[in-house]
Amino acid sequence: VRKFVHFCDKTRMNISGIAESTLETFVSNGWVKNFGDLYELEQHHDEIVDTDGFGEKSYQRMQKSIDASRKCTLNQFIAGLGIPMVGRSAGRILNKHFGGDWNAFEDAIKSGFDFTVLKDFGETMNNNIHKWYADKDEEMLWRPLLTKIEFIKEENKTMSTKVTPLYGKTVVATGKLENYTRDGIQNKLIELGAVPASSVT
């Protein structure tokens, strides 16, 4: 269940309306066995709306969020897969390197690509990606998903280097900023050409 919670998180595939307890029910009832099953829950509409604490309105809100997540970026997708040590920051780097193209990312793994050539990717992360891809149990979780979603490529929002002194610099945001969430701050830093980091090294 934890893998599904991780996948649905708002900072990953951003599927709202599915609490951990709801996912536990879906899994225990056999409605969700892999990530792709989340996109076929309409097959269980009647059973779901009859579930305690889950009426038609809750179902429609959940379904709307699921449908919205059918279009996602490569970095969202990778971050949601649960590859050890490969989260949002690594997902952004992979998204940029492979141009938002899942097939390019998968082909690189198949060809034995050395991910340590990428910024901030060490040997452990490189090994984790290759081990994850070779794990047949993991593949049974994510492979069915590929026919359910559409990858979208983010527009290059990075501003000109002439107007942003932060271009190319690693920036750690600490404290709070009015009207901005932490993710919002990171997205703004990316727009300014900076590389957001979670801690000072």
Identify the residue ranges that each predicted region occupies.
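Cys/His-rich short segments
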Residues: V1-I15
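Bulky hydrophobic/aromatic packing residues
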Residues: H6, K33, L38-E40, N75-I78
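DNA strand-break repair and replication-stress modules
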Residues: F7, D50-T201
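Residue-level signal for pocket-adjacent positions within structured domains
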Residues: C8-K10, K33, Q43, V195
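A local structural micro-motif
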Residues: S16, N34-F35, V86, A197
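Compact, charge-rich alpha-helical regulatory domains located at protein termini
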Residues: E20-S21, N29-G55
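Short C-terminal domain-edge/linker segments immediately following a structured domain
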Residues: S21-T22, H97
